[in-house]
Amino acid sequence: MAATASAIRYAPEDPNLPKPWKGLVDSRTGYLYFWNPETNVTQYERPASSAPPKLAAIPVSSSVQTNQQSSSGFNSGKEDDKYGRGSDGPKSDSGSRFNEAGRTGPISSNDAASGLGNASSGGSSARGPPSSAAGNELSPEAYCRKHEITVSGGQVPPPLMSFEATGLPNELLREVYSAGFSAPSPIQAQSWPIAMQNRDIVAIAKTGSGKTLGYLIPGFMHLQRIHNDSRMGPTILVLSPTRELATQIQVEALKFGKSSKISCACLYGGAPKGPQLKEIERGVDIVVATPGRLNDILEMKRISLHQVSYLVLDEADRMLDMGFEPQIRKIVNEVPTKRQTLMYTATWPKEVRKIAADLLVNPAQVNIGNVDELVANKSITQTIEVLAPMEKHSRLEQILRSQEPGSKIIIFCSTKRMCDQLARNLTRTFGAAAIHGDKSQAERDDVLNQFRSGRTPVLVATDVAARGLDVKDIRVVVNYDFPNGVEDYVHRIGRTGRAGATGLAYTFFGDQDAKHASDLIKILEGANQKVPPQVREMATRGGGGMNKFRRWGTPSSGGGGGRGGYGDSGYGGRGESGYGSRGDSGYGGRGDSGGRGSWAPSRDSSGSSGWGRERSRSPERFRGGPPSTSSPPRSFHEAMMMKNR
């Protein structure tokens, strides 16, 4: 009794809680529940509803066992449900007293008082910044309005506006505070209390919102309650669209789970299976994987998912965009139906709604911001510059020179070849490196490590790095080429302005991009950004406008571009020949052969066939061209421009 009571403490005072109710926290499980000292009743449900405004709920799955109570996610108790999926929550190690909502007399007032008193007298308590930094002077309703949080799905607990209110173990709080966090992000504040009730969640939030810790922290608490033998298989499974994101999730899991001795393996394509299989055989608590590689290992029968009771689908929308839905469904079929499932996505199209309805049971839906419209982070200053292709390189150098020395900058290109060329041109003056789908995993890891450390402050990338790349303090994003659509545009610029910081995004826009003008204007206006008159003119003309640039190629001047195969790395960008191949490079996309109105030189029959790369990328190949009447080129990029005149 004493050991159990010592794990209980009072939650921070809540002025909106009706008297005489008290908030209590079980420090071992992290559960927040409520106690009435007059009637000696304890319950998980908040006595007075303070849930934020509700949206339409997700349709209930018919293919998964639906045994959750829609009002709160708890039933009166199914003793045969080990994980508490759809019942009263997981069985706590501290005893059955915390298992049932509304059960009378689970603790006495004396037990509660004595146990809670010990929480404040211990010398190892992790103290963080003052709670006022977390904004807990706001009511839950005001907090939700301020951060544009809306929820749906039955009775949903209010957000936890400070780390002190979460009831996290001291060792975990120390890890969080040492990382420099002063308060939970909005997605964390609202999703943590729901996840700790063992409920399924759909969380819709923009990139850089802190979603990784949004599911990792409740996952750590889940591991403390479920004592599985890790050698028999993982307890937590996280699916990720790209290997970059997968490795970053692993880094975060090991960083914040270090004090709790949590083990994590990462499975992704483009790397040998041997070391990954050895990690699994040693036993791990968490597996982070791309769907393709995990399916390969499942087919080899080298991993078992029968112990997985906490499943996360991170960036679910991008996994579906990449064609991973069959692999996801195959993996989920190997996971027990008695599980907790959390889905995180930046967008909410019908394809994501469908798979959410199939895989989740009576989920709570958490929305940060506007779900129905694609919106950009308002903390990012967006500058659109209408340029001819020959003007882009010199303008890029001006932007780079205008930044403070050592500022981290990402430049996005449409093709892998342009990515390499720009990196070569910029590396001597600015320190640049390229990353794209043709790089080996070792090369990519090395480039990312140099970029993170600041040794190489400029990263030139295709869209393979647009999703999931989580590097702190990125100051500037430059869209050297406009992407395939505004969705990728929003994801690209989302690399900066993360975790409450501000950022800059420069985008070079040309006549070949005019078809995106109307959508781009909506994004800019939605974020209160300036719209250049030339872009408005393009939108009015429906794609015309910059006739003087048409000699460099138009959207109708060439074809050749097609989708490439699917791969663990995500979008590989547009391929050189426009014909992607199956592998880790992802979507091949449109090519340099003119499918995008590129400035790339046309390939005649006397040279290359136009179906693959040229053998040489050096400037020598351009010396045989017609003499130029202008001044000598200052860069390889300008040499290519002059060759095409």
Curated annotation (Swiss-Prot):
Intervals of motif DEAD box: 314-317
Motif range (Q motif): 161-189
The keyword Transport is annotated on this UniProt entry: no
Basic and acidic residues compositional bias, start-end: 77-91, 612-623
Compositionally biased intervals (Gly residues): 556-597
GO molecular function, one term: ATP binding
Name this protein carries in UniProt: DEAD-box ATP-dependent RNA helicase 46
Organism: Arabidopsis thaliana (Mouse-ear cress)
Originating gene: RH46
